[in-house]
Regions:
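Short acidic DE-rich linear segments
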Residues: 1-4, 112-120
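Short, charged, low-complexity amphipathic alpha-helix
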Residues: 1-16
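Generic alpha-helical secondary structure signal
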Residues: 7-10, 70-74
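Amphipathic alpha-helical coiled-coil segments
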Residues: 12, 16-33, 37-40, 76-104, ...
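Short coil/loop "hinge" linkers that interrupt or connect long alpha-helical coiled-coils or helical hairpins
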Residues: 46-71
C-alpha cells in the first residue's frame, strides 16, 4: 500500500467535508433565526400587556419612529411568520444534509473497507 488514498475515496472525503460545512452553516442560521423568533415573541407579549393608548415606537434602520400599537403588532406578526417559515426551511435542509452526510459516511466505509482499495 502506497499510503495514498484512491481518487474515489479522496472525492468522497471532500464531499463529506463539504456536507459537514453546510451542516455547520445551517446550524448557525437556525440558531440566529431561533433568536429572532424568540425576540419577536417577547415583543408581542410585551405589546399585549400595554394599553392601546400607550405611545409605541418601532425601529426603522437607525431611527425610532412613533407608530400605532396595532400597526406594530401586525408588523411583528408578519415578521414572525416569515421567520417561522425560514426556520422550517432550514430545518428541512438540515434533515436533507444529515441524510446526505450519513449516506456519504456509509459509502466511505464501503470504499475503505473494500479489498480492492489496498491493491493500488
Amino acid at each position: 500500500m502506497s499510503g495514498e488514498l484512491p481518487p474515489q475515496v479522496q472525492n468522497q472525503l471532500a464531499q463529506l467535508q463539504q456536507v459537514q460545512q453546510q451542516a455547520q452553516a445551517l446550524a448557525q442560521q437556525k440558531s440566529q433565526l431561533e433568536i429572532m423568533v424568540k425576540e419577536s415573541d417577547m415583543a408581542l407579549e410585551e405589546l399585549g400587556k400595554i394599553d392601546e393608548d400607550v405611545t409605541v415606537f418601532k425601529n426603522i434602520g437607525n431611527l425610532m419612529i412613533k407608530a400605532e400599537k396595532d400597526t406594530v403588532v401586525e408588523d411583528l406578526k408578519e415578521k414572525k411568520e416569515t421567520l417561522d417559515l425560514r426556520l422550517q426551511t432550514i430545518i428541512r435542509q438540515e434533515e436533507r444534509i444529515h441524510k446526505r452526510f450519513t449516506q456519504l459516511q456509509e459509502q466511505l466505509k464501503t470504499s475503505v473497507g473494500s479489498p480492492g482499495m489496498h491493491a493500488e
